[in-house]
Amino acid sequence: MGDVAVETPANNVTPLTKAAPLDTIPNIDSLEGTGNDGSDEYATLKRLQRHLEYIQLQEEYIKDEQRSLKRELVRAQEEIKRIQSVPLVIGQFMEAIDQNTGIVQSSTGSNYVVRILSTLDREKLKPSSSVALHRHSNALVDILPPEADSSIAMLGENEKPDVTYADVGGLDMQKQEIREAVELPLTQFDLYKQIGIDPPRGVLLYGPPGTGKTMLVKAVANSTTASFIRVNGSEFVQKYLGEGPRMVRDVFRMARENSPAIIFIDEIDAIATKRFDAQTGADREVQRILLELLNQMDGFEQSSNVKVIMATNRADTLDPALLRPGRLDRKIEFPSLRDRRERRLIFSTIASKMSLSPEVDLDSLIVRNEPLSGAVIAAIMQEAGLRAVRKNRYNIIPRSDLEDAYAAQVKTGQEADRLEFYR
């Protein structure tokens, strides 16, 4: 027999670890006539060639499938964008029936069983969350941020008031009490824990109009690094049933998510008056808002890193359940009548920012007996400044501008009787 192409015996063939490229595989014709050893090698080679051809066919098929799936993905993404680009209806998610359907409430108050877009994250789809519905089919196509359809907003770092405690004249005791109840628990909570007491959860500021309640809260917002949420009590009263309690939950949820936080509710008497046997749906809705507020303040989800400040001019009308300890632990009164020391501090604080004539004597205004609140004193100084601007003066003349401003802002005799309904 002639020379054999493969000299290694069949029982000593080295195992193949990697398929060789086609161009490196020997020609089949070169293996002819190699005997039994050559026939085994030839059979192995043919088997490997068939396997390689099969793999190449599979590769081409997979590439075709990949290109087809990419086209389908692009079409699906374009369809989703088209659906979400049309004007959508804001609704509220109620509950999920299964993975693909759920119950939603539209802005008109009606409930619908709708399909849920498959691309939405089901973990973010929680009851009472705001959602976007298709205008024709009411299908749930998007999940909105919690504050997207709410008037509740949190003040950013650049939006906080520029009022400091030094800008608030007088009110030394009120400043100390509100700092102990609001700022200290947020900054030095360990002190309360070491003593073994719970810090105050809420503070009520009450007093006549113009006594500095809101201004002191502005100073609190400026001096603390905590998140600050401001809302007016009347904003909770909405057109549709259930919207008010939902807004209360949204406010406290936002505060807990951004804790430490301070919630300031101004004019709390709009929703927290004493409860009675309501005869109308509107009165019952206001009472439901109050119940939700009471639950959020001392319920199971209450947080020590969330402080509530409320302000009102009518503390006598508030519900006793709101005033009890555990909800509003500290009640700070802002008196309408200021003594001479308080007046001097207010006049000096306001006058320090103004250009006054050297002859100005504020003591002549301080010693007068008319009742002056902080807002009235600020109005006197502002009116004096406006009169100086009107006359193109750089300084305020005491006997003319200040006296005229005092007479314009402080009513006496018959003029005071006409404005008695404001008191």
UniProtKB/Swiss-Prot annotation:
Pfam families: AAA, Prot_ATP_ID_OB_C. GO terms for cellular component: cytoplasm; nucleus; proteasome regulatory particle, base subcomplex. CDD domains: RecA-like_PAN_like. It comes from the Eukaryota. Keywords: ATP-binding, Cytoplasm, Nucleotide-binding, Nucleus, Proteasome. It is found in: Cytoplasm; Nucleus. InterPro entries: 26S_Proteasome_ATPase, AAA+_ATPase, ATPase_AAA_core, ATPase_AAA_CS, NA-bd_OB-fold, P-loop_NTPase, Prot_ATP_ID_OB_2nd. ATP binds at G207, P208, P209, G210, T211, G212, K213, T214. One of its GO terms (molecular function) is ATP hydrolysis activity. The 26S proteasome is involved in the ATP-dependent degradation of ubiquitinated proteins. The regulatory (or ATPase) complex confers ATP dependency and substrate specificity to the 26S complex. Belongs to the AAA ATPase family. This is 26S proteasome regulatory subunit 6B homolog. It comes from Aspergillus niger.
